Design a protein with these regions (language model features):
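Active-site core of metal-dependent hydrolases
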Residues: 1-50, 61, 70
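His/Asp/Glu-enriched, well-ordered alpha-helical/loop segment
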Residues: 2-3, 36, 53-135
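Active-site/binding-pocket entry motifs
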Residues: 17, 87, 91, 157-158
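Alpha-helix N-cap/helix-start motif
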Residues: 21, 48, 74-78, 141
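Short, glycine/charged-enriched secondary-structure capping and boundary segments
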Residues: 24-27, 54-55, 77-80, 146-148
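Short C-terminal domain-edge/linker segments immediately following a structured domain
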Residues: 41-45, 69-71, 93-98, 160-166
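C-terminal cap of metal-dependent C-N hydrolases
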Residues: 124-166
Length: 166
């Protein structure tokens, strides 16, 4: 607040938000919303995770990321945002199709918002970054993590049937 950075700050990991008492959390949620501070989670398996649903309900932008790809901290990172969406859903108890869709938004659309990306989406003139997967619904895709049939970046095919074609 003192530095005038409202809307230009994102806090990564934010493990502590998964450990605070309810009264403290309410005050923090208000401050985060008021200052437009985004929270980025990796949805870790071995640490507290920010209360994603509560954050979103309070009007806080939440994104998800994988900041380690088979590195010194974990051998499990792979930078797959569909998998990250599943982990966000799993760690936060998302069970309904609506909540599973929210997990996908967190790992895609909301990340783009935090980064200030424009032309992100599926409207005419957008970048045409997309992943094509088989599935009956978004909920099924998040829960089952089907193989990636086609991956486009900037409208260019970069992977087909799970293999890089560059």
């Amino acid at each position: 607040r003192a530095l005038g950075l409202a809307g230009r700050v994102a806090v990564s990991h934010a493990f502590c938000l998964g450990m605070v008492e309810e009264r403290e959390l309410e005050a923090l949620l208000e401050l985060l919303r008021e200052q437009r501070i985004a929270i980025m989670t990796t949805a870790p398996g071995d640490r507290p995770t920010p209360p994603v649903r509560r954050l979103r309900e309070a009007g806080v932008t939440v994104g998800a990321g994988s900041d380690g790809v088979r590195d010194a901290w974990t051998p499990f990172g792979n930078a797959d945002m569909l998998e990250r969406a599943m982990l966000v859903a799993y760690r936060n108890g998302f069970r309904t199709d609506r909540l599973l869709h929210d997990a996908l938004d967190i790992a895609t659309r909301d990340n783009a918002a935090v980064l200030g990306l424009t032309g992100y989406g599926l409207a005419p003139g957008d970048r045409a970054d997309l992943v094509v997967v088989p599935g009956e619904s978004l909920g099924e895709i998040i829960a089952m993590r089907p193989p990636r049939a086609l991956v486009l970046s900037g409208g260019r095919v970069v992977a087909r049937d799970g293999r890089c074609v560059l």
